[in-house]
Regions:
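Conserved acetyl-CoA binding element of GNAT-fold acetyltransferases
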Residues: 80-93, 240-251
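Short amphipathic alpha-helix that is part of the acyltransferase structural core
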Residues: 1-58, 85, 139, 154-201, ...
């Protein structure tokens, strides 16, 4: 019985079939098995135009494997190229070891110029590396502590952490912050570094049509005319009150103003802490300068990065794989890459969250 590999829509495989495959074959319940989230992720993304972009392996008996894939333009040194974000990869355990997973990956690398994925399992890592992917074990994650006592209570930490972690002391600022909607804007924002597209169409889909999460976007400006944008998501449960920075957009000259706004916003609104993921050195130097904790380097504390349910992992961040059909030094310079919590399905709701949302 022959096995076909291809894009789901080309092989006549529906989102319902794929989400059901995730439900049956993945080791735990994940949002990709929720049809509402699955459809938003893989059909409603602007470049997909209503067509499911996942890559599947199938024969006459049905699905054998799936790689979640979202088509997305990638800008390398200012030039748009054919890119994709990879997410959860799953093969029916009954055919594991037959090469179907590798065939799926080979199909994908033959159709794109660059690929990125996060949260790589140890089982999948050897296949990625053998296929020419680069691997970053830890994506930089920074944490700004507002309420030390509450953060220590939910974290793993050393006995001396309380001497090193202090409550936020935000300075006075003269910034103007305006809540905006991307659907009201006329121009794409400036984005530093090599990055996935942040066109208005992308941002409207990502932040204003999400089936479960609510995002707030602020435009931050000062008297000198510099302005930038921050996208925030509030994580408020019985166990935690954390502010997630999902995106920081604008030229480098706006970065510190945006971070200052976030620190003050978190303190004024009673959040316990703020966290942000970023690979871009132009941005990360400001987190270091402003003494944000590092999930990788601040070994005396491990602040949770999973919240439904609350869970501490070591380290409290995730990994990145990246691949280029024609790699060069510029592509391999991760310090020039801007990947944030916005990208590669990193800000995905858990099924626990979806269950609470639907109550």
């Amino acid at each position: 019985m022959s096995t076909k590999i291809g894009f789901a829509d080309d092989l006549g495989v529906s989102s319902t079939e794929i989400s059901e495959f995730y439900k049956v074959h993945y080791q735990r319940d994940i949002a990709l098995s929720d049809l509402g989230f699955h459809t938003w992720q893989f059909e409603k993304a602007p470049i997909n135009r209503g067509v499911n972009s996942c890559v599947v392996a199938a024969n006459d008996s049905g699905l054998l494997g799936v790689m979640g894939l979202n088509r997305r333009k990638f800008y390398l040194s200012g030039n748009a190229i054919n890119g994709a974000e990879l997410t959860t990869w799953i093969v029916d355990q009954r055919i594991k070891g037959t090469g179907v997973g590798t065939k799926i990956l080979n199909f994908i690398t033959s159709h794109f110029d660059v690929l990125f994925g996060m949260g790589i399992s140890q089982d999948a890592l050897p296949i990625y590396v053998q296929s020419g992917f680069y691997y970053l074990r830890y994506i930089p994650r920074y944490i700004h502590v507002v309420d030390t006592k509450k953060v220590l209570n939910i974290s793993d930490h050393t006995t001396y952490a309380s001497k090193l972690v202090k409550d936020s002391s935000c300075e006075q600022h003269h910034l103007h912050a305006e809540k905006i909607f991307w659907s009201d804007q006329r121009h794409n924002p400036c984005v530093e570094g090599n990055h996935f597209s942040r066109s208005l169409e992308d941002l409207i889909w990502r932040y204003e049509s999400h089936p479960y999460f609510k995002y707030n976007t602020y435009k931050i400006s000062n008297s000198g005319g510099s302005f930038g944008y921050v996208v925030l998501r509030e994580e408020i449960t019985d166990d935690v009150k954390i502010l997630h920075v999902i995106d920081i957009l604008g030229s480098e000259s706006s970065f510190e103003n945006s971070i200052t706004f976030v620190e003050n916003y978190a303190k004024n609104e009673g959040f316990w802490a703020v966290d942000v993921y970023s690979t871009l050195s132009q941005l990360n130097k400001y987190f270091n300068y402003r003494s944000w904790l590092s999930a990788v380097d601040s070994s005396f504390i491990n602040v949770p990065h999973l919240f439904h349910p609350l869970e501490v992992r070591n380290p409290a961040t995730t990994s990145l794989i990246y691949w280029s059909k024609s790699p060069d030094v510029k592509f391999c310079d991760v310090s020039e890459l801007y990947v944030s919590k916005q990208d590669c399905d990193l800000d995905r709701p858990t099924m626990d969250f979806i269950g609470v949302y639907n109550e």
